[in-house]
């Protein structure tokens, strides 16, 4: 298979790599159908991401189609299922993990940052990180699940609810996702940015 590998700032090469294989009972192998390019990917591309080491396959937003599963994972996933991925790799045993705060796991790593990511043709990971998408979800929608999940968490932690005033600083992808969810929850949203184009997009 092919993978786009960041070998140095501003340098990406397409390499041939071995096909991932099902090894564990909870493994899920899927074909990458579409990926997003996040601001952190661009930062890494420019050499400004301090935790990205080269060489690295970037990408942590994707939608894929299941190709093969381990014998335990087949209870939840079947070949042909449309899926997306929760890209955090957690320990499951630290204090935050034990209390449902896996986003701040003491030992967390990220696909596409600390581990190779989705700018490749096939990917394998544990079923814990896989989310099956319902029928009717487009590839574009599936790819945006990860940033919308970030926005949903932000809106919930901010207490966005009917009649509450919420200020969002920054109208990029995450800011816009947060704004849409806050509005859907009934909040009054003020979003700020220094770029007129982003504000226009948020207004639309």
How would you name each of these model-derived features?
Residues 8-10, 24:
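Residue-level recognition of beta-strand termini and adjacent short loop/turns
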Residues 40-46:
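Cytochrome P450 core scaffold surrounding the K-helix E-X-X-R motif
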Residues 61, 81-82, 96, 122, ...:
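Residue-level marker of beta-strand positions
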Residues 1, 26, 163-164:
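Nucleotide donor/acceptor-binding cores
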Residues 137-204:
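Mid-domain Rossmann-like dinucleotide-binding core that forms the NAD(H)/NADP(H) cofactor-binding site
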Residues 38, 87-131, 135:
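Cysteine-cluster motifs in flexible loop/terminal segments that predominantly coordinate metals
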Residues 7, 19-20, 53-59, 111-115, ...:
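Short Gly/Pro-enriched turn/cap motifs at secondary-structure boundaries
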Residues 20-35, 48-95, 134-136:
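Glycine-rich beta-strand-centered segment in the early N-terminal region that forms part
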């Amino acid at each position: 298979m092919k993978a786009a590998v960041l070998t140095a700032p501003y340098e990406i090469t397409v390499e041939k790599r071995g096909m991932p294989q099902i090894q564990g009972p909870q493994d899920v192998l899927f074909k990458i159908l579409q990926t997003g390019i996040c601001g952190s990917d661009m930062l890494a591309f420019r050499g400004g991401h301090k935790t990205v080491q080269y060489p690295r396959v970037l990408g942590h937003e994707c939608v894929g189609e299941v190709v093969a599963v381990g014998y335990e994972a087949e209870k939840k996933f079947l070949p042909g299922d449309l899926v997306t991925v929760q890209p955090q790799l957690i320990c499951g045993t630290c204090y935050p993990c034990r209390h449902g705060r896996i986003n701040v796991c003491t030992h967390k790593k990220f696909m596409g940052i600390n581990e190779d990511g989705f700018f490749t043709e096939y990917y394998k990971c544990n079923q814990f990180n896989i989310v099956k998408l319902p029928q009717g979800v487009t590839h574009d929608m599936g790819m945006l699940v990860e940033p919308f999940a970030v926005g949903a968490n932000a809106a919930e932690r901010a207490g966005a609810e009917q009649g509450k005033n919420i200020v969002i600083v920054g109208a990029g992808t995450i800011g816009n996702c947060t704004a849409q969810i806050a509005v859907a929850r009934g909040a009054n949203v003020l979003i700020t940015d220094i770029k007129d184009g982003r504000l226009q997009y948020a207004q639309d």
